[in-house]
Design a protein with these regions (language model features):
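Short, flexible loop segments at boundaries between secondary-structure elements
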Residues: 200, 483-495
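Phosphate-binding loop of NTP-binding sites
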Residues: 87-228, 233-246, 323, 376-377
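P-loop/Walker A phosphate-binding loop and immediately adjacent motor/lid segment at beta-alpha junctions
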Residues: 57-60, 75-76, 219-222, 244-247, ...
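N-terminal leader/targeting and accessory segments in enzymes
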Residues: 1-89, 231, 266-268, 289, ...
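Active-site beta-alpha connecting loops in nucleotide-dependent enzymes
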Residues: 38, 47-52, 340-342, 371-434, ...
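Acidic, Mg2+-coordinating active-site environments of NTP-dependent enzymes
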Residues: 38-39, 60, 70-75, 163, ...
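Conserved phosphate/oxyanion-binding catalytic-loop motifs
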Residues: 358
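Short glycine-rich anion-binding loops that position phosphate/pyrophosphate groups of nucleotides
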Residues: 47-49, 174-175, 197-198, 230-231, ...
């Protein structure tokens, strides 16, 4: 994708007033000095522990713009205060604001982001950007981060604009919001799914985590979709943290309403069985011209598993309604949505049991998947999980507590131990258990799965939690190929 050259002054306005003698024509932009050449602008921002200029070794560049202070910047480098916060806007300017040529939906929250952006990409025929990958569903690139850096985001959006893609659903992580990675993205819809303990190795506490998420809704979005069954979702509305010009669609699977919402999407008559999910989709919209309430309802049947997918389907419906999809079309669209890799992904066993592979790696997510799967399981519910190394130690006992409370049998194993001793990680988790009845420790991870599968009887299920779609395991600092799905399927085909 070729991009016409732009003047340095046009890219940096209004953040930096350029001396005419410093004017340059810029053919590319980068934050990586390894990609520099005489045509490229280097945007050298300050990171958490290092400054980008620390890695500079005299590579040629069209110009260098850096974030002050820095003790000895290269000769001719231009200081730009708060450059890190402006990278997204500069990149959007360079690529001619691609988000303005499409509808971009930003999804934030602890759980449900990946499923929702995947469902939206299915429903709209557009692209997705998130943990599972970047791009249209038939050409997904492997994701390096849930939300990539600001330049990569704008590069993706510009490439998809050239392909004629009209809708993009994007996961917006708390890290991305705190680090201004989505600056320069003009969102048409912002979605809040829920919030529970996660990423407290990065955020000071849960309040700091919430405030990072809330940044998305301080923008003047055309529409916000808010889960009001979640206490933090209600707080966004109660504390007026959503921009006053934003139209709010409340979502509830528990019959809740909120006075600030212009419309409500809800579910009634929810039933879960071996075939999937059944509910009545309900939509109430206060018309903006005369404030008359318009109500609609229709039955929905989905082959997806788990109670939490009712919420994912409601969020999908709310976004489609915000995109002016006729209500009468939505039940059929929801019925066609297929499962997301590593999200309540069912692998049927020959004897009538099932293995459910899920990405749940927080205490709340583990509760949700176990509670969500339980109605589909007439027999015994097993749970295999581990906890990531070099991450929030405090959630480890909470994970074990969740498994002990909501599964019949719990097996604690490895996740991504990274540089920690796996036995120490498991010991941390075990502190959250009570009598430790029906709790086993089996490692490594593939051995835990192979130990459980032959014990499952007809009607039983095992939730294999934590890795989901991932096809690797990090041991030390090395990524090794590993997949929960492959482990199950290899066992199925073994003699």
């Amino acid at each position: 994708m070729s991009q016409p050259k732009k003047s340095l002054s046009s890219l940096l306005a209004p953040y930096l007033t350029l001396d005419p003698a410093a004017e340059r024509m810029i053919g590319a932009i980068t934050t990586d000095n390894r990609q520099l050449d005489a045509d490229t602008l280097w945007l050298a921002a300050r990171g958490v522990s290092h400054h980008a200029l620390d890695y500079y070794h005299g590579e040629p560049a069209a110009a260098i713009v850096y974030e002050p202070p820095y003790p000895a910047p290269p000769a001719g480098a231009l200081p730009c205060p708060d450059l890190g916060a402006h990278l997204g806007d500069i990149a959007a300017n360079y690529y001619d604001h691609p988000a303005r040529a499409m509808t971009v939906i930003g999804v934030t929250g602890t759980d449900g982001k990946s499923s929702l952006v995947h469902f939206l990409a299915q429903a709209t025929g557009g692209a997705m950007l998130g943990t599972i990958g970047y791009g249209p569903l038939d050409a997904l690139e492997v994701a390096s981060h849930t939300t990539p850096d600001p330049l990569r985001i704008q590069q993706h959006l510009a490439a998809w604009r050239e392909r004629g893609i009209k809708t993009v659903a994007m996961e917006v992580s708390s890290h991305a919001l705190a680090q201004h990675r989505v600056a320069g993205v003009d969102f048409a819809i912002g979605v809040f799914t829920n919030l529970s303990r996660d990423h407290l190795d990065y955020h000071r506490d849960l309040e700091d985590y919430f405030q990072a998420k809330a940044r998305l809704f301080a923008r003047p979005l055309p529409c916000a979709v808010i889960n009001i069954d979640d206490a933090h979702g209600r707080r966004l509305l109660d504390d007026n943290l959503v921009h006053p010009d934003t139209r709010i669609i409340a979502v509830s699977s528990a019959g809740n309403h909120h006075p600030r919402a212009a419309a409500t999407v809800s579910a009634g008559n929810i039933a879960l069985d071996a075939d999937g999910i059944h509910f009545t989709l309900q939509y109430e919209d206060a018309k903006r011209d005369n404030h008359a309430v318009s109500s609609h309802s229709a039955p929905v049947t989905s082959h997806l598993l788990a109670r939490f997918n009712v919420d994912n389907l409601l969020n999908t419906a709310a976004c489609l309604l915000a995109l002016d999809t006729p209500f009468t079309d939505i039940p059929a669209i929801l019925a066609t949505l297929h499962g997301v890799p590593g999200r309540a992904e069912r692998i049927r066993l020959p004897n009538g049991a099932a293995a459910i592979v899920d990405y749940a790696h927080t205490p709340a997510a583990l509760v949700n998947i176990l509670q969500g799967i339980r109605p589909h399981v007439p027999g015994k519910l097993w749970c295999i999980f581990g906890c990531g190394g070099d991450r929030d130690h405090g959630k480890r006992p909470l994970m074990a507590q969740a498994a002990e409370n909501y599964a019949d049998v719990t097996v604690i194993t490895d996740d991504n131990p990274r540089t920690e001793n796996p036995a120490d990680i498991i010991a941390d988790a075990l502190r959250g258990t009570g009598k430790r009845e029906n709790i086993w420790v089996k490692r490594p991870r593939e051995e835990a799965i192979r130990w459980v599968l032959p014990q499952l009887q007809a009607g039983d299920a095992v939730v294999i939690a934590g890795k989901g779609h991932e096809d690797y395991q990090i041991i030390g600092t090395t990524k090794h190929h590993y997949s929960d799905q492959e482990t199950v399927r290899t066992w199925l085909t073994s003699p």
